Amino acid sequence: MIPIDIVERGQQDYTACFDAMQTFTAQRGPDTPDTIWLVEHPPVFTLGLAGDPAHLLAPGNIPLVKVDRGGQITYHGPGQVVAYLLLDLRRRGLFVKALVDAIEAAVIDTLATYNVASERKAGAPGIYLSAGPHQGAKIAALGLKIRNGCSYHGVSLNLAMDLSPFTQINPCGYAGLETVDMVTAGARDASGRAVDAADWQRVSHVLADRLVAQLQHRANAHPAEAATA
């Protein structure tokens, strides 16, 4: 079983983190450890490779960064758990689809830990609430880049955020899509206590643990030439 290191980077400027991901991936060797970075960003909009700038409806004073992941526009900000997956997919024997499935399953498992029901939607990557007054609202977004069989970028899970910046965009390219966080969804821990922004570290490590479990479950389930994009 190939280990995965968990690195908590805390609060970090998006551009600095993006540059670090690219450098890490470019400098990888056959023995470079697989790593998940846990990060929280200051407010920033990011636009994917094929993203349409028209989905930024009202930029205001939040910067826009064009990046090399897939997908459209999204928002990162305080109170959001971001997990970047820097993995050698060939070494792990993972297809990209299996990686996406693992990420989405890990988010669903994390939310279930906090008594929030969620689900995938066909053709719309990310995780959505499956019950309650905000059923259908998006609570997590994902976007990936595969280079030489190695992944970077990852997934963002909304914990306790100022959600108003999401109204300034068409989230992931979908006009009018409601976006919520775990607080809005009524997330509670095993003792019944409502989660809040102070739970960032705890929630981030639950997500990391679920990501590792899902990735290890899928390891070597696919041929080693899987990730070639």
From Swiss-Prot:
Pathway: Protein modification; protein lipoylation via endogenous pathway; protein N(6)-(lipoyl)lysine from octanoyl-[acyl-carrier-protein]: step 1/2. In the reaction, the free carboxyl group of octanoic acid is attached via an amide linkage to the epsilon-amino group of a specific lysine residue of lipoyl domains of lipoate-dependent enzymes. InterPro entries: aa-tRNA-synth_II/BPL/LPL (IPR045864), BPL_LPL_catalytic (IPR004143), Octanoyltransferase (IPR000544), Octanoyltransferase_CS (IPR020605). Residues 30-223 form the BPL/LPL catalytic domain. Pfam families: LplA-B_cat. This is Octanoyltransferase. The keyword Cell inner membrane does not apply. The gene is lipB. It comes from Ralstonia nicotianae (strain ATCC BAA-1114 / GMI1000).
